[in-house]
From Swiss-Prot:
It comes from Prochlorococcus marinus (strain SARG / CCMP1375 / SS120). HAMAP family: UvrC. GO terms for cellular component: cytoplasm; excinuclease repair complex. Residues 215-250 form the UVR domain. Belongs to the UvrC family. GO terms for biological process: nucleotide-excision repair; SOS response. Keywords: Cytoplasm, DNA damage, DNA excision, DNA repair, Excision nuclease, SOS response. This is UvrABC system protein C. The lineage of its organism: Bacteria, Bacillati, Cyanobacteriota, Cyanophyceae, Synechococcales. GO terms for molecular function: DNA binding; excinuclease ABC activity. Residues 26-105 form the GIY-YIG domain. Interacts with UvrB in an incision complex. InterPro entries: GIY-YIG_endonuc, GIY-YIG_endonuc_sf, GIY-YIG_UvrC_Cho, Hlx-hairpin-Hlx_DNA-bd_motif, RuvA_2-like, UVR_dom, UVR_dom_sf, UvrABC_protein_C. The keyword Phosphoprotein does not apply. The gene is uvrC.
Amino acid sequence: MRSLNDNLPLILDPTRLKTTLDNIPKAPGCYLMKDNEDNIIYIGKSINLNSRVKSYFRRRNDNNPKNSLMLKQVSLIDFIVTDNELEALNLESNLIKSNQPHYNILLKDDKKYPYLCITWSEDYPRILIVRRRRNRADKDRYYGPYVDVTSLRNTLFLIKKIFPLRQRQRPLYKDKTCLNYSIGRCPGVCQKIISSSDYRTVIKKVEMIIQGRTSELKKLLEEKMHIYSKEMKYEEALKIKNQLSGLNTFSQTQKITEPDSSINRDVIAHASNDSNTSIQLFQIRAGKLIARLAFTADSIKTNKENIIQKVIEEHYSQLDPVVIPKEILLDNQIEKIEVISEWLSEMKGSKVNIKIPKISKKANMVSLVKKNAELELTKLSKGVEKANLALEELAELLDLPFKPRRIEGYDISHIQGSDAVGSQVVFVEGMPAKHHYRKFIIKDETIKLGHSDDYLSIYELITRRFSRWSKYKEKGVNLSDIRNYKSSILDPSTLADFPDLVMIDGGKGQLNIALKALEKLNLSEDIKLCSLAKKNEDIFIPGNNKPLKCNNDDNGLLLLRRLRDEAHRFAVTFHRKRRTLGMRRTELTEIPGIGPKRIKALLLHFNSVQAIKMARKEEIASAPGVGRELAEHIWNYFNK
């Protein structure tokens, strides 16, 4: 276990920093930067590990916002040596995929643009339009993010007309098929009329359409149709003929961009300002534009000249190699173009060319993509300007010495003291940073059904949130040295950073109890505090018994209201979830012989009590820790 000193950033411990740097070899490989909780926050590669890692700690890098932000959190550096640079690139790609380090995730999780998800983690995969990746579903495959959601929905609609697909997450009926099966829209997934292996074969065909391999799929289907005809399986042959007809209709809906149907290429271009970068990627397959993808990157987190290379590494490392095109056109030169080309070629199994065209039709195509990126950046900048104005007005309203980049909001939720929980929501640069949100289960045993105490709950909440910083201060650490004054919306959630402002949902009483908690931690002078009462939307600050005066349309007040409402929503949602889970478990605990561990296993396996009630005996028996005898016992209980 590390000591408190070992948890300090290396830049604050010169002796440990020198020892760390001296032990890094002058060889190709990957380096892993970790924070004080052993979380990997950055993975890099280099042909000379020693030289590359040392470069982060040179004075001239102080002007690099991304590096200065990251180095405030690096407490440990590990390394892995490889034989050459290409091997280091492959290793880096695999490590990033498995660890998802914060500072390697260049592309923002922008929920404005949807993905198409194929749930390969399930026995019978579904095809969904989603705006965030599913948890605990590593085998799922994502395509996107797509700019044109209407076109995406139309594509999915046409695909479902060509191939019968699973329509529901759970069965509608327990012992009979639904209307979707009767009209041929579903192959009978719920009742397992089609086997998992046969259904997954259908999904693989659908995936070929999404990947732009429609011509290849047509050839496979034509060959299969001829085989069925020879074997006199005319009904099966007719099904394939109808699918081919549907594919021809689908192909006609795609925009032709190149007269040559053999052209498979991606065109990538970008536009940047000081805070954000917009990247557009056009996918052209068989001479047709099959998709227009859009990404947003944080300009602070990488050098603008390297941004396209980072996009290529991050985007293509997540793809099925068969999707990688033969040619990639860029708007800018990248540093390691030969190594990247070799890496992509090795992944694909055939040559991948990367070009930066200056004249000809290819250059015109790159210019078109760049115009789209510039338009998207303009839209993005307007949102940033609005958020900055709100922060400036809030700083003036609360008499803060600087704009509050990171603001935390806290709220409590319970019903007469039962299932009491707390929420922490975080706004960075005026925008929700949802991966920083935290949920708290109130542990004080005096708070229970019939005895609620919001003040005691807030006191516990604030104490638990800031106790680590109190320990640092007791140790003599200068908090201003490790405080993150350049908070970014993409800061890692493991960064226990001081907020520039803390807002409590409530009035003077709630504010005073939060202040007492900070005084107990010796942090009341370090953290700015306010509260926002629902009645009259009054703002209170320490040392002032009367609410601050401001207009109802003040941008600073509107920002605090959004934060307050979000903290309330997050707390109430968590409380309802805990209460519902308690009710679920109460129903299951009525079954004799079922303990807490088996209840948890059943709920994790089926997701709901309703699904358990509808399950067959053999399905219940497939849950972890549940055998045939217990499964029959459970089934009999629900089917008396």
